[in-house]
Amino acid sequence: MNALTSLKLIDGKATAARVLAEVREQVQELRQGGVQPGLVVVLVGADAASQVYVRNKVLRAEEVGIRSQEHRLPADTTQAHLLTLIDRLNRDPEVNGILVQLPLPAHIDEHCVLQAINPLKDVDGFHSENVGGLAQGRDVLTPCTPSGCMRLLRDACGELRGKHAVVVGRSNIVGKPMAALLLQADCTVTVVHSRSRDLPALCRQADILVAAVGKPRLIGADCLKPGAVVIDVGINRINEDGQNHLVGDVDFAAALPQVAGITPVPGGVGPMTIAYLMKNTLLALDLQQQAAHQERTACLSPC
């Protein structure tokens, strides 16, 4: 890596390490007060990639002092059985965060399962209560990847107010919540998608460009304004010169001379996603404690 690349690189690994250190310190303070946050990860089936993701999440939780559990269910698990497990976890006071690893087997209704999770324990931020709360600017659990991207942007850019942000992709997991978080930060936001016309012209307006479409090297130099900051959420496996490579949605080599900062793939956004899962577990605990306090206060109030 040359000096120019180093200067422009937005290092997700280093930032994630700082986030995890912050979480570890908060967890230590909580444990001194007799409280240990708890995270449960549920995996249905034996998808190899999902197994790796789940293991990484559990390991990170253990590293920062969060009590973690795995529930590994066979691929033929019924929806009713999965919903029963979620109901039990919802009622368990020692469980602060619940994550159901996606994708689920085809016979299980993903929407139904995600809606069954208590919104205050929904550390993925996918429940409609949290999605709506994000749109309204309320203090709710938000999806981990967009939240991690916002930390990278604030560290790289400082003040975001007034900047023009272009989000390429409109998925429920990244694109839409990313746009909502950027709006909350007082950015001017454009969302570009598969039906948008003249992708390069729209992208060239961006002070901040977030690419999240899952198309290798879709964003070339012709899509970038000089001095833009680029967050590449895409992670695509391609075969090139007889070897497998992981590349982003942005053509890194073509983009580098033009941008002020860019995340690499791998090592950019990925580590931030898991780091913000840990932060969300602490936020979930805090929201649950607030809700319990409000409930106690309401019970003590005169009619």
UniProtKB/Swiss-Prot annotation:
Homodimer. Belongs to the tetrahydrofolate dehydrogenase/cyclohydrolase family. Its EC number is 1.5.1.5, 3.5.4.9. NADP(+) binds at G169, R170, S171, S194, I235. The keyword NADP applies. GO terms for molecular function: methenyltetrahydrofolate cyclohydrolase activity; methylenetetrahydrofolate dehydrogenase (NADP+) activity. Keywords: Amino-acid biosynthesis, Histidine biosynthesis, Hydrolase, Methionine biosynthesis, Multifunctional enzyme, NADP, One-carbon metabolism, Oxidoreductase, Purine biosynthesis. GO terms for cellular component: cytosol. Gene3D superfamilies: Leucine Dehydrogenase, chain A, domain 1, NAD(P)-binding Rossmann-like Domain. It holds the Pfam family THF_DHG_CYH_C. Catalyzes the oxidation of 5,10-methylenetetrahydrofolate to 5,10-methenyltetrahydrofolate and then the hydrolysis of 5,10-methenyltetrahydrofolate to 10-formyltetrahydrofolate. GO terms for biological process: L-histidine biosynthetic process; methionine biosynthetic process; purine nucleotide biosynthetic process; tetrahydrofolate interconversion. The gene is folD2. HAMAP family: THF_DHG_CYH. This is Bifunctional protein FolD 2. InterPro entries: Aminoacid_DH-like_N_sf, NAD(P)-bd_dom_sf, THF_DH/CycHdrlase, THF_DH/CycHdrlase_cat_dom, THF_DH/CycHdrlase_CS, THF_DH/CycHdrlase_NAD-bd_dom. It catalyses: (6R)-5,10-methylene-5,6,7,8-tetrahydrofolate + NADP(+) = (6R)-5,10-methenyltetrahydrofolate + NADPH; (6R)-5,10-methenyltetrahydrofolate + H2O = (6R)-10-formyltetrahydrofolate + H(+). Pathway: One-carbon metabolism; tetrahydrofolate interconversion.
